[in-house]
Regions:
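Generic secretory/membrane-interface signal
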Residues: 3-5, 14, 49, 186, ...
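Thiamine diphosphate
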Residues: 262-274
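Conserved short loop/turn motifs at secondary-structure junctions
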Residues: 86-91, 116-117, 190-195, 226-230, ...
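N-terminal capping/small domains of soluble enzymes
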Residues: 2-122
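Alpha/beta enzyme core
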Residues: 19, 48, 64-83, 99-105, ...
């Protein structure tokens, strides 16, 4: 055997073991009954919310201009969407002006509810509610990072500290909504990177936020469970959703929302199974 062939064999063996770097980053729930397996079809229409103007826009190399955003919003209305996420108004002047234009020029149909996104940070929440001044109704979407990796490597925080961030943001939502009685608000919370979060912790932090908002049958809270990074086969995500739905407090007064990204090419399967 030549030196060259020996080296080739070593490189081949190394490449074949390349899969080992992909560690399991998700967490299975403590109880996973997978009752959804018994369903062979979806028998109830979901509520569709377009996130193209926010999440889709972030994916573009050159984000949409104000004019393009207005045209796209009108297109989504014509398609028939009744909930449309219009952006992250505290993120940039364009995002802010887009929202203000929709409100001030009365471009939002009576049967359409706009949605905006905000991190759980004081000044961003304040700016977000300011941008909504004059809106007839709106969904305000709060999020903060909860995954094991982000807690350990980015924020270097304990679980209690992460919960405090979410709860404080939820309390600010209550405060600002009370100052704007002319607007009909619906609140939404996301544990960002839900799929990389321990399920017991995801449940705990969601329940803490729900406790602050006190949903009712007439004022339901949305709990969004995103696959911010797709980490598993679809049945794992479905098991995670099943666990959350079975254990969230005030479940009858909640709307559970799914937001799967397509990193693994399984976003549609994630949505249907979840």
């Amino acid at each position: 055997m030549t030196i060259a062939s020996t080296r080739w064999e070593r490189e081949k063996e190394k490449d074949m073991k390349n899969y080992e770097k992909y560690k399991v980053g998700y967490f299975m729930p403590p109880v996973c009954e997978m009752t959804w397996v018994k369903k062979d079809h979806i028998d109830q229409a979901p509520i569709w919310c377009s996130v193209d103007l926010r999440d889709g826009n972030q994916a573009l190399i050159v984000p949409m201009s104000l004019t393009e955003k207005l045209e796209y919003f009108q297109f989504l209305v014509e398609v028939g969407f009744k909930e449309i996420e219009v952006g992250f108004p505290a993120a940039s002047e364009t995002e802010y002006e887009f929202l203000r234009t929709l409100i001030e020029e009365n471009r939002i149909p009576e049967d359409v509810t706009i949605q905006v996104l905000t991190q759980s940070r004081d000044h961003i929440i304040e700016e977000t509610f300011r941008a909504l001044k004059g809106a007839k109704k709106a969904i305000v979407h709060l999020y903060n990072s909860t995954s094991y990796a982000q807690r350990q490597q980015v924020f270097r925080m304990e679980k209690k500290e992460i919960i405090d961030i979410a709860v404080h943001g939820a309390q600010l939502f209550n405060h600002y909504a009370q100052t704007m009685p002319e607007t009909e608000f619906q609140f939404q919370y996301s544990p960002e990177s839900f799929t990389g979060t321990e399920m017991e912790f995801a449940l705990e932090i969601c329940n803490e936020v729900i406790g602050v908002w006190q949903p009712t049958a007439d004022r339901k809270v949305i709990i969004n469970l995103p696959a911010t990074v797709a980490m598993s086969m679809p049945h794992v995500y479905a098991g995670q959703i099943e666990y959350m739905c079975a254990n969230l407090r005030d479940r009858e007064n909640l709307i559970v929302s799914l937001h799967p990204h397509n990193d693994r090419g399984t976003a549609v399967a994630d949505s249907e199974l979840g």
